[in-house]
Amino acid sequence: MARLEVPEREILPEWLTGFVDGEGNFSIVTVEKKSSDAPSISSYKVWLHFQITQHSRDTDLMERIATFFECGGVKKRNIDAVDFKLNKFEELENIIIPFFQKYPLQSAKVLDFLAFVEAANVIKSKTARQWTPE
């Protein structure tokens, strides 16, 4: 059976917020690094990651989302999945966070977003070097 062609439509901010509510992910990634000189001392590398995953048949949609945000990239994960990914701090801080502050998430995912924003504020602050995960 042939797949029906879906007409390309303008991506509206409210639609995109709802889409991310269901399909998006806000991650805070930490990696511990032990000091070779003092094994009892650890440092942490922390970065933020925003991602939307879809079936590979929706690659065009993911590329339109990347165009909408004017940042990030689309990458095929495997034969069946494609990701819109973004982890550049400046783009997260200047594009993604303000977007979801203007067009708030409606599901429990808003709690993930609020933690994401808090982590961004810590990373941006001068005390980021002293931050330890709880």
Predicted regions and their residues:
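Sequence-level preference for short, compositionally simple segments enriched
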Residues: 1-134
